[in-house]
Amino acid sequence: MTNGIEKKFKEPDQTQMLNRLWELQKSNGYIHDDNIKELANAFNVSEVEVEGVISFYHFFQRNPTGKYTIYLNNSIIADIKGFERIKETLERETGATFGTNDRTGTFGLFLTPCIGLSDHEPSALINFYPFINLNTSKVKDIITKLKNGASAESICDAPADNIRYTPPGNKTVFFKKFAPGSVISKLVQATPLGIIEELKKSELAGRGGAYFPTWKKWNSAMVQPALPKFVVCNADEGEPGTFKDRVLMNREANSLIEGMIICGYTIGAEYGIIYLRGEYWWLKNKLDEAIKEYHSKGLLGEDCGNIKGFSFDIRIQMGAGSYVCGEETALLESLEGKRGEPRTKWFFPVEKGYLQLPTVINNVETFCAAAKIIEMGAEEYLKLGIPGSPGTKLISVSGDCQLPGIYEIEWGMTIEELLGLCKADDPYYIQVSGPSGECISINEKSRRMSMIDLPGQKDIRCGGSFMIFNKHRDILKILVNFSEFFKHESCGICTPCRAGNFIIQRKLDRLNNGFANETDLDEIKSWGTIMKNTSRCGLGKTAANSLIIAMDKFHDYFKTKLDKNYDGLNLKFDMDAATKDYEEYKI
């Protein structure tokens, strides 16, 4: 850690494992055998454990990945925007095929899930710098420049924030001018209990999707006797179709930092960590610069913000490409330099979190909202939204619409209103809260978005992702993409998720090929129920959500995908076709 943190508290050496792996990956293009022994000795762990950590993360490679490592996004939004054309062009121009390097070792081509640029698809990362709105001519130009010796950094794009809508009448919560120290100055006259009461009054709930009351989490950490305590920002925004936190970090880093400082002051923590997803390497410098500015103004470090006796510091920890690390206990394991496998829930992180010490984990939007609420006051905040869901929410809109981007809506806006704002093109199927969320049909356009979660209520929660698909999109193709994503991202530690995602994927393949029957549909639902009830973490519990909901809402569509001639026997196998090559070439 930096400055005061180093002096007062030393983190165990292994917490630096991911940082060291990143250094090796970036300098060498891969992690070779000698590095394994070196790391095992440095961190006093076995070589097998080091190998286990490396193999868990998507961006750590044991084989060379080329001078220019290209990760092309293969999410469903990229797919409908021209992914296949870009994939073919990259292979043709580089001379490599995906999953390998070209013969000269210049280019390495790899696929990766959503990289947080759904409003700029198709997109890719080259040496972890963003390249957006790709087309065939742009790809040719990029590869030519790289072949001529240009660095990826020198020719990369600067993704626009695309803030399309904020509440009229200057009622935006997130995007008002915010000078460093705006909120910290208020802490001089505030007490931790006063902060808790203000957040309770505002009804702020976690914006990662679970909507747990923020004041309850902070209060639980505040009363813990163990020291030191930690504040962790979950900036591992990995849900496909979500990019709101990217925009906040790029545009409102001050709000994020002050939200973390407020939390530290409230719970009695001195140490903050931003866990930034590997796909957002290009944002790290901006966050580093913001942290330096706060240090230079006395707003971080000893006697933070001129508050005697209050010290707080922040460091950034890079993730390395693992969706499951968005789950809070998996994130904690990753912070400790281990495989990002979810913990069994004997304790909440506020009781035993990072290094088994009290830890508050909130996402970027939650910390920013907390800062803004303390700045404007709960009374003003409560004037926005609807009863039971006060305030505003950031929605990442992408897909078949003319204006993809960020929409800051007041809670209570209907699906129809949002579709109108983004100029949706003949919407038919809408995916809310990403693949792990809920799909809705255009017939449900009158539903409101809110935080209300009651049985039978018509409102819909939205964690942040809002993907729009028109009538020309194949629903099954969308769901297969989601299923492949979950199968790939499952950490594999629990059987229901590991086996369930694989089996569901096979069932969808049968459905896609016209071999499925009603029994297959029933078995998909059964496996979805098993996963929901018995998986270890939220990934497995929600992986089949959209598929099962879609099977109910679009039942007639799924009927058209079944084998109409199925009579209880599998008569599709063609022995003559299967042995054709043997008969032709046998000696």
Please report, for each region that a protein language model flagged, where it lies by residue.
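Feature of Fe-S/electron-transfer and energy-metabolism proteins
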Residues: 1-587
